[in-house]
Every structure is written in C-alpha cells, then in structure tokens.
Amino acid sequence: MIGDLFVTGMVVPELGLAIEETTKTLGVEFTPIQESPLQMRTEKGVEIFNLRFVYSLGRPPHLELIEGIPDGYYDPKGGYIRHVGLWVDDLADASAQLAGSGMPLEASGMNGEVEPYAFVFHALPWGLRVELVDRVQQPTFEAWLGGGELHI
C-alpha cells in the first residue's frame, strides 16, 4: 500500500445539518467546524476558496464531512463519498506511483508557486478518488483532533 488509510471524506450540501444528523443517528462526535482558505489546481485551473469541514473524533479512519461548494471541485451534487485519504512519506513519489499505475492526477494543493503542497488527489474514471497527504502534516492534524488549531 502506498500509505496509511486515515479518512473517508464526504461532500455534503449543508454541513451543520450533516453533523447534526450523523451525531444523532450514529453517535459520532466531531471536531468544531474548521474554516480554511485553500488554493488548489484542478482541471478547470486554479481554485481559491474557503473550505468548511469537520473530522470525527476517536480512532482512525476518520469520517470527514466537507461542505459542498457549487460549481467547484467540492460541488455537493446531493452528497457523496468523495475520497479516501492516505498519509504518505514522500508526496511527489507516491503521486507519481499512482499516476504510473493508471490513476491520473486530478488536483493538487498549492502554496503560492509551490506545487504539490500538502496534498494531491488522484481519480479513476469510475469514481474512486484517493487523497495523498504529506505525512509532515500529521502532527498538526493530530494536535487539532486533540483540541488544538489546524494550520495547513
């Protein structure tokens, strides 16, 4: 396996309602809502937006609920499982491995001119998406799950 599975991400039309219903029906507890400015390159070009999301608390793999953004990379279209996420030690190498195995690069995180930065997405034509996340981000992420602030 290229990395360690840690999350399944779902795009939802209304984040607050999704949190409420998931907590009520499944007893899942979530982090506070995180709002994070994000810049990424997609097949449509560079997208810059504020991403709103939560992660389930407890042991991984986590459930990530992402508030949909119409007409963008996270278009809600009724809510769906968006991706599985893997921690990787070498983002560029793992991304090249997926691309070389027939799973093309779909989007990559950016930090100004630095690309890829923090994460990339690869996708198969039938819908499976894999998010590779640089393991350098893991300590910050785990501190956030423990009640700290998330800085991407």
Regions found by a protein language model. Name each.
Residues 29-74, 117-139:
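Conserved short beta-strand elements that form part of the metal-binding/catalytic scaffold
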Residues 5, 49, 79, 115-117:
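Short, solvent-exposed coil/turn segments
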Residues 1-6, 36:
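A short, surface-exposed helix-loop junction/capping segment
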Residues 134-152:
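Acidic/histidine-enriched, glycine/proline-rich intrinsically disordered or flexible terminal extensions
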Residues 73-79, 141-145:
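A short, polar/proline- and glycine-enriched secondary-structure boundary/capping micro-motif
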Residues 10-59, 93-115, 146-152:
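Core segments of cupin and vicinal oxygen chelate
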Residues 5-13, 55-57, 75-92:
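Vicinal oxygen chelate
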Residues 7, 21, 136:
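Extracellular/lumenal glycan-associated surfaces
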